Amino acid sequence: METDSIDSVIDDDEIHQKHQFSSTKSQGGATVVISPATSVYELLECPVCTNSMYPPIHQCHNGHTLCSTCKSRVHNRCPTCRQELGDIRCLALEKVAESLELPCKYYNLGCLGIFPYYSKLKHESQCNFRPYSCPYAGSECAAVGDITFLVAHLRDDHKVDMHTGCTFNHRYVKSNPREVENATWMLTVFQCFGQYFCLHFEAFQLGMAPVYMAFLRFMGDEDDARNYTYSLEVGGSGRKQTWEGTPRSVRDSHRKVRDSHDGLIIQRNMALFFSGGDKKELKLRVTGRIWKEQQNPDSGVCITSMCSS
Amino acid sequence: MDLDSMDCTSTMDVTDDEEIHQDRHSYASVSKHHHTNNNTTNVNAAASGLLPTTTSVHELLECPVCTNSMYPPIHQCHNGHTLCSTCKARVHNRCPTCRQELGDIRCLALEKVAESLELPCKHMSLGCPEIFPYYSKLKHETVCNFRPYSCPYAGSECSVTGDIPFLVAHLRDDHKVDMHSGCTFNHRYVKSNPREVENATWMLTVFHCFGQYFCLHFEAFQLGMAPVYMAFLRFMGDETEARNYNYSLEVGGYGRKLIWEGTPRSVRDSHRKVRDSHDGLIIQRNMALFFSGGDRKELKLRVTGRIWKEQQQSGEGGGACIPNLS
């Protein structure tokens, strides 16, 4: 739900566009599943909820197993044989699980690791091959996939603007700047250096103070994100504020990055000052640049940032 | 326990001047093919790498009391401590691990885990390269070609096992068995009281030829109700290799002759099994006494024999074949 839509216009100003480098990474390979481990792994699946079981694993007198969560729901009756459950533990299966090693569930996405059963979930929650969540903030979008899929998803399903280039110049216009409480979101995707970057712009309450924030997220993993640096700049009427930092991986959620204040934060009074005029309308022009860390940028005079707060 | 000790006079190539005309001259062909391919010492390093999973799961399938492998039904207490069926019957409903009441609880999960387990043969260190499902492992191990051999000495309940060179030394040093080299033999068996057949007696001689070892057995036993003497040959090695050889045993006297020709049995087959299958030269007591001559008061049998390899074309020359009159 957008009230007073923010208009994003790219102007051909004196910003010098660098040409982009295109590099494509390919991941391949799949792990062969060890068949004895597979059938033992099936034994570790709760017959009721089909989730993996973890200690304490329960069983009935006949040996039918059950996870702790389901045991508390079945009212002391075995779901398999209807016998009384009692309070019997299947210690043997817990020990079998200790000695079990299994491939990561993302092995078909390229992960070659094999992990002890009791470490598998932890690894999978941070596996570099796990699919990415949709970076579109606002709607609770549950889409997941690889970067290529998500870029198409952002373009086709969320109608996000797509741009190519390492520099950008955005104008954000809002007719009623007082309504900061209702956070609004603006997302633009940039393609440069063969990668994709998400530029976020939004308004939110920082403590009790209304602020606007712009920040960049890298569509990929944290390790790759660290190869890049970006700057964001806003100003007007003799004032300028610049943020320079490293893009955050989309592995970190939008809210996490926002709440860590990792980006350009503009207090509302300064935003109105930058907008000029009669302080009735928000007009911000945010310019920015993305570069690779290994390169030595030797262009332009660096104007020291005068930050008035 | 020897009653009226049987005197075995082993004379190689001895010809007695009796009226029996020995037409065939014995071949003293001692061909020593030293095949050093004893399978028992051929340790195949091809025992495939064990999954850490397999080893530690296998330990879970060991009964904590008797340390034998457990098979269904596997029992447990409320706390999950497992126990085999045999030990459960002995522990009077008290868990040996935590002293809690056992009850009647089955560890079905561990039984199913065992189904999916594959383990190397326990004779892996003796050369067996194979891996088997848990529930098939014991069966294989009883027939594995790499399993150690039992002592072929019959009579005493000798429980010694080992490979063939070890057992040959054991027979010579511990059982004082006569050792001979050569492919032909000529044995005299003398017993002063031939009536006592009920108490079986045993005589064992080991022959070394073709680079292999053969056990010649001679004994007396009741065949049904009839007292008989029997001589047979066993090969110190496996059945498949024993089939490469043939042997003959011959006994006779006074115009009669009995000849047995056959294939040696592997020492994998026990002495009793071979005897009870009648696979050898069987002499009824009345014929044995006839062959012994004299006043039928004393047993005097001369058994001659020969071992040859099947692949060889043994052109047996000479001698009229006298049909066996029984």
From Swiss-Prot, chain A:
| Zinc finger (SIAH-type) in chain | 99-159
Binding of Zn(2+) 1, residues: C104, C111, H123, C127
In the UniProt record, which is one GO cellular component term? cytoplasm
Quaternary assembly:
Homodimer; homodimerization is essential for its function. Interacts with UBC28 and NAC021/NAC022. Interacts with SINAT6. Interacts with ATG6 and TRAF1A. Interacts with WAV3. Interacts with FREE1.
Q: Which GO terms describe its biological process?
A: protein ubiquitination; ubiquitin-dependent protein catabolic process
Q: Which Pfam families match?
A: Sina_RING, Sina_TRAF, Sina_ZnF
Binding of Zn(2+) 2 occurs at C134, C141, H153, H158
Which residue stretches, if any, does this entry annotate as coiled coil? Answer: none
For the keyword Hydrolase, the answer is: no
| Name the UniProt record assigns to this protein | E3 ubiquitin-protein ligase SINAT5
Q: What is known of its domains?
A: The RING-type zinc finger domain is essential for ubiquitin ligase activity.
The family annotation for this protein states: Belongs to the SINA (Seven in absentia) family.
* Biological role: E3 ubiquitin-protein ligase that mediates ubiquitination and subsequent proteasomal degradation of target proteins. E3 ubiquitin ligases accept ubiquitin from an E2 ubiquitin-conjugating enzyme in the form of a thioester and then directly transfers the ubiquitin to targeted substrates. Mediates the ubiquitination and proteasomal-dependent degradation of NAC021/NAC022, a transcription activator that functions downstream of the auxin signals, thereby acting as a down-regulator of auxin signals. Involved in the formation of lateral roots.
Q: Which InterPro entries match?
A: 7-in-absentia-prot_TRAF-dom, E3_ubiquitin-ligase_SINA, Sina-like_RING, TRAF-like, Znf_RING, Znf_RING/FYVE/PHD, Znf_SIAH
Zinc finger intervals, RING-type = 46-82
Provide the GO MF annotations for this entry: transferase activity; zinc ion binding
Region feature (SBD): 96-289
The reply to whether Transmembrane helix figures as a keyword in the UniProt entry is: no
Q: Where in the cell is it found?
A: Nucleus; Cytoplasm
State the reactions this protein catalyses. S-ubiquitinyl-[E2 ubiquitin-conjugating enzyme]-L-cysteine + [acceptor protein]-L-lysine = [E2 ubiquitin-conjugating enzyme]-L-cysteine + N(6)-ubiquitinyl-[acceptor protein]-L-lysine
Induction field: By auxin. Induced by salt stress.
The record's annotation in SUPFAM superfamilies points to:
RING/U-box, TRAF domain-like
Q: In which pathway does it act?
A: Protein modification; protein ubiquitination
EC number(s): the record gives: 2.3.2.27
Curated annotation (Swiss-Prot), chain B:
Induction details: Induced by drought stress, salt stress, osmotic shock and abscisic acid (ABA).
**Annotated spans, Disordered:** 1-44
What PROSITE patterns does this protein's entry cite? ZF_RING_2, ZF_SIAH
CDD domains in the record, alphabetically? RING-HC_SIAHs, Sina
The pathway it acts in is: Protein modification; protein ubiquitination
Report the catalytic activity: S-ubiquitinyl-[E2 ubiquitin-conjugating enzyme]-L-cysteine + [acceptor protein]-L-lysine = [E2 ubiquitin-conjugating enzyme]-L-cysteine + N(6)-ubiquitinyl-[acceptor protein]-L-lysine
Residue ranges of coiled coil:
none
Provide the protein's localization.
Endosome, Multivesicular body; Cytoplasmic vesicle, Autophagosome
Q: Which residues bind Zn(2+) 1?
A: C121, C128, H140, C144
Per the record, which residues fall in region SBD? 113-306
Which residues hold Zn(2+) 2? C151, C158, H170, H175
Q: What does this protein do?
A: E3 ubiquitin-protein ligase that mediates ubiquitination and subsequent proteasomal degradation of target proteins. E3 ubiquitin ligases accept ubiquitin from an E2 ubiquitin-conjugating enzyme in the form of a thioester and then directly transfers the ubiquitin to targeted substrates. It probably triggers the ubiquitin-mediated degradation of different substrates. Modulates directly the ubiquitination and proteasomal-dependent degradation of FREE1, a component of the ESCRT-I complex.
Q: How does it assemble?
A: Interacts with SINAT6. Interacts with WAV3. Interacts with FREE1. Interacts with ELC/VPS23A.
Its name, as the record gives it, is E3 ubiquitin-protein ligase SINAT3
Q: What is the lineage of its organism?
A: Eukaryota, Viridiplantae, Streptophyta, Embryophyta, Tracheophyta
